[in-house]
């Protein structure tokens, strides 16, 4: 009996996951995230140099970050731009150096382009959440400016704190000697989860539950880590881009990776947005749970009725009706005068 109950619960669980995946697939088709990812990748490439220039300017404004600027750059390019990170870092640093020599109007234009990227991200995520109410211009600009100014500061502060924790003598013992390398190895994964979680909870112009956002963030972070390893393996083992494009191979490699990254980000957003819809649908509907063969689970717990039992019950009902008819009072008739 207990095994049957456990089997039924497992069937219900897998069927629930399957129905959620079907709902998620329908959402992905409706929202066309491949087109949205292509748009965001194009805007990202246009805004990459301005965004990096603004980020480095914000880090330079704080003396505590001057000593670790190289570490921050190495961490970002190594963990978020696989295979071609070194080449991209050289070019972007050169572009940023040229951009920093511009006039005030040019620097203001860089800030505007960086804001355009954040605005495109905001619109894409709010479209996924089916948000009808738009933020006012003042609120939207304030949020975009906060992301540009506070985002680099938070990233730098987290890396500084991590470097400080690693350097503590508390972790120099034999018992904890293997903990820190494992922690440092998982650090990019933790940063990815935190970044996706913050993105899915703050950007949508509606309330998002923490656990829903955490689910989407964890899935997106796992796919991002797998994507990094898979893309780096493809670029190194199958150097078709370098054979075709030569010295310009970095450009298509960067574009493809940015496109895949946005596909992963939007997929995590779709999971986060689809979860409350699916739960509301399940709670409001009275759909009969079925097993993997399509049979109702309720019917499995109903005992089978033999044909002999049905015929015996039918004959007993006929005899009862005959007795009632025999005991009924006879109607009297009046003679005609």
UniProtKB/Swiss-Prot annotation:
It comes from the Bacteria. GO terms for cellular component: plasma membrane. Keywords: Cell inner membrane, Cell membrane, Membrane, Transmembrane, Transmembrane helix. It holds the Pfam family Virul_fac_BrkB. InterPro entries: UPF0761_bac, Virul_fac_BrkB. Residues 292-337 are annotated as: Disordered. It is a multi-pass membrane protein. The chain crosses the membrane at residues 4-24, 45-65, 102-122, 137-157, 183-203, 213-233, 247-267. Residues 328-337 have a biased composition (Polar residues). Its main location: membrane. Coiled coil: none annotated. It is found in: Cell inner membrane. Belongs to the UPF0761 family. This is UPF0761 membrane protein Shewana3_0311. It comes from Shewanella sp. (strain ANA-3).
């Amino acid at each position: 009996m207990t095994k049957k109950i456990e089997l039924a619960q497992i069937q219900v669980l897998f069927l629930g996951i399957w129905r959620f995946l079907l709902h998620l697939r329908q959402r992905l088709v409706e929202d066309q995230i491949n087109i949205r990812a292509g748009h965001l990748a194009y805007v990202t490439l246009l805004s990459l140099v301005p965004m990096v220039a603004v980020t480095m300017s914000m880090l330079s404004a704080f003396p505590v970050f001057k000593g670790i600027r190289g570490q921050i750059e190495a961490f970002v390019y190594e963990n978020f731009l696989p295979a071609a990170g070194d080449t991209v870092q050289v070019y972007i640093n050169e572009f940023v150096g040229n951009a920093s020599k511009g006039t005030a109007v040019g620097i203001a234009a860089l800030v505007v382009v960086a804001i355009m990227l954040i605005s495109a991200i905001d619109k894409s995520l709010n479209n996924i959440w089916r948000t009808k109410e738009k933020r006012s211009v003042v609120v939207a600009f304030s949020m975009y400016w906060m992301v540009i100014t506070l985002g680099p500061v938070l990233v730098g502060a987290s890396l500084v704190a991590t470097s400080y924790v690693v350097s503590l003598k508390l972790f120099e013992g034999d018992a904890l000697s293997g903990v820190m390398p494992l922690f440092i190895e998982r650090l990019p994964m933790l940063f990815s989860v935190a970044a996706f979680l913050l993105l899915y909870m703050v950007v949508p112009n509606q309330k998002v539950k923490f656990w829903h956002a955490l689910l989407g963030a964890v899935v997106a972070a796992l796919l991002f880590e797998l994507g990094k390893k898979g893309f780096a393996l493809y670029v190194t083992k199958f150097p078709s881009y370098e054979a075709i494009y030569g010295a310009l191979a970095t450009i298509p490699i960067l574009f493809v990776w940015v496109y895949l990254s946005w596909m992963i980000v939007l997929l995590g957003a779709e999971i986060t947005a689809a979860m409350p819809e699916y739960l509301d649908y399940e709670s409001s509907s009275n759909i009969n749970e079925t097993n993997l063969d399509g049979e109702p689970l309720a019917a499995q717990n109903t005992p089978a009725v033999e044909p002999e039992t049905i015929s015996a019950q039918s004959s007993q009902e006929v005899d009862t009706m005959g007795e009632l008819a025999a005991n009924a009072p006879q109607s009297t008739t009046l003679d005609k005068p």
